[in-house]
Amino acid sequence: MTSLLAVIRHGPTEWNELGKIQGRTDIPLSERGKRAIQQLQLPDFVSEIDWITSPLSRAIETGKLLGITEMLIDDRLVETNWGDWEGHVLRDLRAKYGQEMLDNEKKGLDLTPPGGESPRQVCQRLQPLLFDIAASHQQKLIGAITHKGVIRSLLSLAAGWD
């Protein structure tokens, strides 16, 4: 059972431009982000594959701007829950929490923000999605529009990082 998953990260938002941690906060694409996505041109075959997307507006809007007319929303593709860190700049969190923050960042897949989820938990959320894709799209390519934290977790699963 072989399937291929092509992954696209959503376009930039105002929070991306300010360096703020977004997580599940539903921030739309910025005007600059919309223009950046509109300048991209995907290969013609992209319109012929099945697409899934995060439920967050920035991912859905990215798909629409790319000309993808049909997308299945899958909650498992939602961005990492960064809990209490959402809306903050990482530099500010490091300044506020000092060594505690640096120690947290060294935890890798087990880094868990207060009130949030770890990359390992994101991997656990994604594994059933990957099995579903493999079962329903045998020998086919499927596209996904999602977020940086999810893409990092997908890479972790693909590479066997722990």
Each PLM stretch: what is its role?
Residues T2-S3, I8-L72, K96:
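Active-site-proximal alpha-helix that buttresses catalytic centers in soluble enzyme cores
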Residues P55, D75, K148:
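Short secondary-structure boundary segments
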Residues E17-L18, G83-D84, L155-S156:
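Short, function-defining helix-loop hinge/capping sites that tune catalysis or transport
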Residues I37, A59, L90, G98-L102, ...:
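A general structural signal for well-ordered alpha-helical segments in protein cores
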Residues T2, E14, I60, I68, ...:
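Active-site-adjacent alpha-helix immediately C-terminal to a catalytic or transition-state-stabilizing loop
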Residues L66-Q127:
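Phosphate-handling substructures
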Residues T53-S54, Q124, I145-T146:
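Short beta-strand scaffold positions
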